[in-house]
Amino acid sequence: MTQANIHLRLAVPEDVPALRELINKSVRGLQTLDYSPAQIEGALQTVFGVDSQLIADGTYIVAEAERNAIARDEAAPQPFELIIVACGGWSKRKTLFGSDHWTGREDALLDPLRDAAKIRAFFVHPDWARRGVGSMILQACEDAARSAGFTRFEMGATLTGAKLFGAKGYVAVKPISIPLANGELLPVIHMEKQA
């Protein structure tokens, strides 16, 4: 599957049910080598999920592909339908990570001259992992943040996501342990990059 088969667009509120399903599949399908089942369950209840503020701000991107693009039978074409296969965003707000359920939110606006834009909430469907979709979204986020005047980016990367972000020039700054609703701790990595 080439990147030409992927369409990027801004997320809209009507995408939330599909995003919830995608996030659940992404976390359960791709993060099991880096996190325990208890950490995954706790994270899905606390920090992994939809952040409606990113959608409202127009800074959350979805990648769409044809529903049957992976295993399509050309002899028996099926109706054209796009599905969301990945998502990710950037923020002009202080919150570094967290979904609508996260209580540690800081919704104050950042100053592009002093602060780093936040790269946020990247999730890829397991069937679309390692196909360049996350990289496409990351590039679009960085370009949009640059256009808004930001010269630095930072994130709280999962142990799984840190591999991609490291390959894209992000540098680990420090480990972070996020307390989860079920008493577990979720290790993530604070990463930064110059624009």
Model-derived features: where do they sit?
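Conserved G/P- and acidic residue-centered "switch" motifs that form tight phosphate/ATP-binding loops
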Residues: 132-134
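Conserved acyl-donor/pantetheine-binding loop and adjacent beta-alpha core of acyl/acetyltransferases
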Residues: 71-129, 139, 144, 177-187
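Small/polar loops that bind or transfer phosphate-bearing groups
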Residues: 11, 120, 156-157
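A short helix-loop-beta-strand connector motif used in the catalytic cores of GNAT acetyltransferases and
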Residues: 47-62, 66-74, 93-97, 118
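A short beta-loop-alpha structural element at the N-terminal edge
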Residues: 7-21
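C-terminal "cap" of GNAT-fold acetyltransferases
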Residues: 158-162, 168, 174, 178-195
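Conserved GNAT-fold acetyl-CoA-binding loop/helix
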Residues: 24-50
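Conserved GNAT acetyl-CoA-binding A-motif
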Residues: 138, 145-158
